[in-house]
């Protein structure tokens, strides 16, 4: 974009999760940490309502108009940016933008490249438009973009650690209250190794949403016996026999996945 002026540059990291797989959307506790791989975005405002995006990694462009845009089948990578724009437009006006992005977070490796793109886009839009939206609200906005626009019913952990991660620290997060604490993790006598299994995964076309539905189905099935519960976080080890007794062969996966959470 040779005519771009006053560019803004932001970055957002990927993450690994030390404790708490699939517990964030069950209102549980998680302990992720940011990694030294990021998505970098550079942007500038335009004089119209169009958003022009260029991905260096994909060597691909995507363009849409803020006044009328939809989910893109042709450029699915752009939907994370489109979704964040859609969330901002619920409470403020946006100018058109030129956006260039590049990253070194391996895609489809479970390191939350999508959350990093959402968080980076949210920071970029805030800074380009001089908004005062705080980081917690940006985290919630980024999660909603993935839930409501992209269509993945993710929890809030990935966006949280991408926004608030700090070098040398893990982040202990209560996914119900959103209370969090940065925990020093110097690892002087140990190292965290991130190993690529070679198995590609993508939340949009995976069974991620099904796992969430099964966990919620277990909660609904248990409510007649445990009326006080609202999520699997409220179910204790002593309640495991109740999970195992849920009737129906079609609920076998529900029993297994919900038991794993507890």
Model-derived regions, located:
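C-terminal nucleotide
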Residues: 2-15, 40-74, 169-258
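ATP-binding N-lobe of GHMP and related small-molecule kinases
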Residues: 1-115, 119-135, 140-144, 149, ...
């Amino acid at each position: 974009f040779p005519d771009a002026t006053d560019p803004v540059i932001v970055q957002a990291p990927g993450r690994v999760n030390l404790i708490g797989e699939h517990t964030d959307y069950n209102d549980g506790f998680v302990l992720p940490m940011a990694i030294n791989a990021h998505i970098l975005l550079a942007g500038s405002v335009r004089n119209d309502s169009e958003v022009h995006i260029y991905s260096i990694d994909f060597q691909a462009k995507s363009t849409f108009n803020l006044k009328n845009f939809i989910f893109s089948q042709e450029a699915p990578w752009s939907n994370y940016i489109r979704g964040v724009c859609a969330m901002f437009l619920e409470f403020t006006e946006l100018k058109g933008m030129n956006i260039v992005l590049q990253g070194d977070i391996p895609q489809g490796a479970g390191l939350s490249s999508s959350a990093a793109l959402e968080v980076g886009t949210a920071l970029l839009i805030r800074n380009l438009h001089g908004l005062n939206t705080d980081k917690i609200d940006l985290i919630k906005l980024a999660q909603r973009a993935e839930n409501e626009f992209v269509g993945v019913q993710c929890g809030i952990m990935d966006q949280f650690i991408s926004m608030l991660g700090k070098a040398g620290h893990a982040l202990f997060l209560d996914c119900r209250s959103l209370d969090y604490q940065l925990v020093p993790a110097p690892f002087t006598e140990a190292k965290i190794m991130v190993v690529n299994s070679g198995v590609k995964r993508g939340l949009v076309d995976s069974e991620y949403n099904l796992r969430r539905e099964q966990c919620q189905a277990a909660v609904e099935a248990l409510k007649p016996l445990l009326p006080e519960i609202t999520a699997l976080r409220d179910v204790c080890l002593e309640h495991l026999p109740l999970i195992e007794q849920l009737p129906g062969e079609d609920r076998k996966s529900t029993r297994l996945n919900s038991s794993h959470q507890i």
